[in-house]
A protein has these predicted regions:
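A bilobed periplasmic-binding-protein/Venus flytrap-type ligand-binding module shared by bacterial periplasmic
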Residues: 43-47, 104-127, 131, 140
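Periplasmic-binding protein-like
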Residues: 98-113, 272-280
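Extracytoplasmic/peripheral linker and loop segments enriched in polar/acidic and small residues
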Residues: 138-139, 172-175, 226-243, 263-280
Length: 280
């Protein structure tokens, strides 16, 4: 997406967006203070074009990577709302009328580093994708009204004709077939005598990310006998390593900045694609 920024602010300080003292924005709120890894504090922006419609004058956002900690803050009266409560608590919260599920233009996926073995081979990447049971992961781990994804662009955005859903018009691009996946691995030269190299899944700290990684770890080991290891990192370190390509498999997600398929597809032509791939 594109948002206007103050030219002088950007030119005078390349890190202008990293601290409350230097950040400049034009939304309904101003960032009053920012305690990194602690809390964000906002006040109403009286210069906002629609300020009369902004009812809440202040907002405080506690920061925590832990879903359980965020839920404790809400249930303890220290916060009013949160996103993504722990899966184990979702049914209880829904029955109590506290969990509200709404549509979101987003996806959750795993990146294969196309420059790291064994994922330099597209057939290996395809095979590893083909054995993942997305429906079971959504049903037993993710929950919360999510849907399994069989293509990169989610439902909810229009085709170029302005009437059809882009995802429905494009059909599925991914399918599950364990036996075919095993054949692809054999064709790639891997078997009992030439096993796959150890594989590490990189993810940032979260109960849900961990549970998904464990499920996929078990799936890949069962299907291919792969030695799959898990590595979690604090978000800042995780993002830096993922961007630098210091991983084999890494979790990722994307929420649309605007409602057009281009917002998802443009990543494939970007030279800074985190999977180290870009289309000419």
């Amino acid at each position: 997406g594109y948002y206007p920024v103050n030219k002088k602010t950007v030119e005078n300080n390349e890190n202008w967006g990293n601290n409350a003292e230097t950040i400049v924005s034009n939304g309904p709120y101003k960032l009053l203070s920012w305690q990194h890894n602690g809390e964000l504090n906002f006040v109403k922006n009286e210069n906002y074009w629609d300020a009369d419609e902004v009812v809440t004058k202040t907002m405080n956002w506690p920061i925590s990577e832990s879903q359980s900690t965020r839920l404790t803050l809400v249930e303890g009266g220290e916060a009013d709302m949160m996103v993504e409560p722990p899966v184990a608590d979702q049914q209880r919260l829904e029955e109590a009328g506290l969990l509200h599920i709404g549509p979101m233009l987003g996806n959750y996926y795993y990146l294969f580093n196309v420059k790291a073995e064994p994922f330099t081979n597209p057939d290996v990447r395809k095979a590893f994708s083909m054995v993942i049971n997305r429906k079971e992961i959504v049903k037993n781990i993710v929950k919360g009204g999510k849907e399994e994804a069989y293509a990169f662009v989610p439902y909810g955005m229009l085709e170029s004709n302005g009437t059809d859903d882009f995802r429905e018009a494009g059909s599925y691009l991914v399918y599950e077939d364990v036996e075919q996946a095993k054949e692809l691995i054999k064709e790639a030269g891997y078997d009992e005598n030439h096993p796959l190299p150890p594989i590490t899944i990189l993810y940032n700290t979260s109960e849900m990310h961990k549970a998904i990684a464990e499920a996929i770890q078990a799936t890949w080991h069962k299907a291919f006998g792969a030695d799959v290891r898990l590595q979690n990192q604090e978000t800042k370190v995780f993002l830096a390593n993922r961007e630098a390509g210091k991983y084999q498999v890494a979790r990722a997600s994307w929420v649309a900045d605007y409602g057009d398929p281009q917002n998802f597809l443009e990543v494939f032509s970007a030279e800074d694609n985190d999977s180290q791939y870009h289309s000419e």
